[in-house]
Amino acid sequence: MARRVFFSFHYQNDINRSMTVRNSWVTQGKEAVGFIDKADFEQIKRQGDNAVHRWIDKQLEGTSVTVVLIGAETLNRPFVQYEICKSLERGNALIGVKIHAIKDMRTLRVSCSGNTHSIIGYYNNKLPAYFDNLCDGIYDYVFDDGYNNLGVWIESAAKKHGK
């Protein structure tokens, strides 16, 4: 059975780069969740943050690994931070994949790399929780050959969590 993986990304800025990663994943017979059509997302978003949170929670069901596709602003986005926190709560393995060097399909440009030492939340004692301290690995999709290695990274992280 294919591993069910949740992909988290900054929709507005990185949808095209994210689709490149997603398509490489599903063409290899894997199941990807966390992707939504823009019109559907806008409809959910109009219903408010709670509706978006419910959608995210539903998408996370049955997943064992969360892959955060890191663009320039990804880790600062509230919904991405929510996805990361909920993934950790459910015990998902967590990896980061930098996607800044993937050319955007529309503009054919690359973007800036996001800072992986970003605060994505706070512990109960108000100390900051940094993404790079919480994840099981950070990779670069282009420079680390993500097309061929994404599955290896995901399986390695899953095994660390006994999944």
Predicted regions and their residues:
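Conserved N-terminal substructure of TIR/SEFIR domains
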Residues: M1-G62, F143, Y147-K163
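C-terminal interaction surface of TIR/SEFIR-family domains
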Residues: R4-F6, M105-K163
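Low-complexity, flexible helical/coil segments
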Residues: D14, D40-Q47, I70-G71, A101-T107, ...
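Short glycine-/acidic-enriched loop or helix-start segments at secondary-structure transitions
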Residues: R17-S18, P78-F79, R106
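Short, glycine/charged-enriched secondary-structure capping and boundary segments
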Residues: T20-N23, Q81-I84, R109-S111
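Conserved beta-strand termini and adjacent loop/short-helix elements that scaffold enzyme active sites
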Residues: I36-K38, V97, Y122, D132
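Conserved beta-strand-loop-alpha-helix hinge of the TIR/SEFIR fold
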Residues: Q59-C85, A93-K103
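Anion (oxyanion) recognition and catalysis
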Residues: L88
